[in-house]
Amino acid sequence: MQGPTLAVLGALLAVAVSLPTPAPRVTVYVDPPAYPMPRYNYTERWHTTGPIPSPFADGREQPVEVRYAASAAACDMLALIADPQVGRTLWEAVRRHARAYNATVIWYKIESGCARPLYYMEYTECEPRKHFGYCRYRTPPFWDSFLAGFAYPTDDELGLIMAAPARLVEGQYRRALYIDGTVAYTDFMVWLPAGDCWFSKLDAARGYTFSACFPAREYEQNKVLRLTYLTQYYPQEAHKAIVDYWFMRHGGVVPPYFEESKGYEPPPAADGGSPAPPGDDEAREDEGETEDGAAGREGNGGPPGPEGDGESPTPEANGGAEGEPKPGPSPDADRPEGWPSLEAITHPPPAPATPAAPDAVPVGVGIGIAAAAIACVAAAAAGAYFVYTRRRGAGPLPRKPKKLPAFGNVNYSALPG
């Protein structure tokens, strides 16, 4: 009797030992990092607000590379990395003897019939003989405030790192890289494992979620403005430090490096374009009833705004309704102690300088200046009159003898008179 009982107890003990130990839901102390310096010197240049280009401009003549990014565990980091062959592009610029190039990097989240702008960065007067982004001028990085709380660009500023992303982050992302007006698209299909990370930047009570989603027509009509729907954030060096610090305080381990995302073969699109429909009404009606479309709307703060009226999605349509997720607090809430706040490093575009009004002159001083001017004019007039009268009394000035041409070998002058 004892033998079978001990065997059963041993089997139960073995099963218990093999079960994963639940991670403690506590934060740990991590030395706050110092505010990092930029990798090189550059001038931060603001631009007047302008439209964000449409992510739906691809087609047969503009192929899209598709990658697959997956996370091993709910509380891990996730990397969206794909080489856009930018080194080859810069080498071709060197061969053309180009002295500089301009570039823009934009990230979107592609939904059913619409796209959410997530990140926008411009580079001007860049050196083609150096690595990408080594430029004389740069704009501040503009972010979706929710994504900025747990994601940051890679060191080359072409990839994207996410720390413990929540379930609603799953889906399709598109990176648009513009170099001197030529665009290269890369799509990333993000997959997350089952379960939720306890410290992900998502809380139903506080309502963290993405911002508005815009159909293709609103991008084409230049209604999606970068300074209206995106927020200025820390530079890449500081952004990486603040997210890594938050991640490590919750027990996370930052990998020493991230591998490139694997290739992915998407299902063939009907028109050879993007795997996501560009937002026409028929596609929205057909896909709005599917299970995936319903899940996407629930996980991303409500359905996109109506397309029939051509207006931007309303706050209620993007998470503003009661009981639905709403935009969260400022993404710099987890900044290390002693760091400047987000408000301290951000500034609006400088207003045009207005000339200052001249200071008022006292009445007494003005009268004195006028009297002195009148006296000077009177003295000058008196001097001119004195010289004129002297010349009249002396008679006309003697005329200089006129030189006449020689006659033979004799030179002579005409007599005065």
Swiss-Prot record:
InterPro entries in the cross-refs: Herpes_glycop_dom, Ig-like_dom_sf
SUPFAM superfamilies: Immunoglobulin (SSF48726)
Glycosylated residues (UniProt): 41, 102
Record has Glycoprotein as a keyword: yes
Membrane association type: Single-pass type I membrane protein
Entry's transmembrane regions: 361-389
Compartments in which it is found: Virion membrane
GO CC annotation: membrane; viral envelope; virion membrane
Ranges per topology, Intravirion: 390-417
Gene3D superfamilies per record: 2.70.230.10
Keyword Glycoprotein: yes
Segments on the Virion surface face: 19-360
Region described as Disordered: 259-355
Domain of life assignment: Viruses
Key words, A-Z: Disulfide bond, Glycoprotein, Host-virus interaction, Membrane, Signal, Transmembrane, Transmembrane helix, Viral attachment to host cell, Viral attachment to host entry receptor, Viral envelope protein, Virion, Virus entry into host cell
One GO BP: entry receptor-mediated virion attachment to host cell
Signal peptide: 1-18
Compositional bias ranges of the Acidic residues kind: 279-292
Disulfide cysteine pairs (residue numbers): 75-197, 114-213, 126-135
The family this protein is said to belong to: Belongs to the herpesviridae glycoprotein D family.
Protein name according to UniProt: Envelope glycoprotein D
Originating organism: Bovine herpesvirus 1.2 (strain ST)
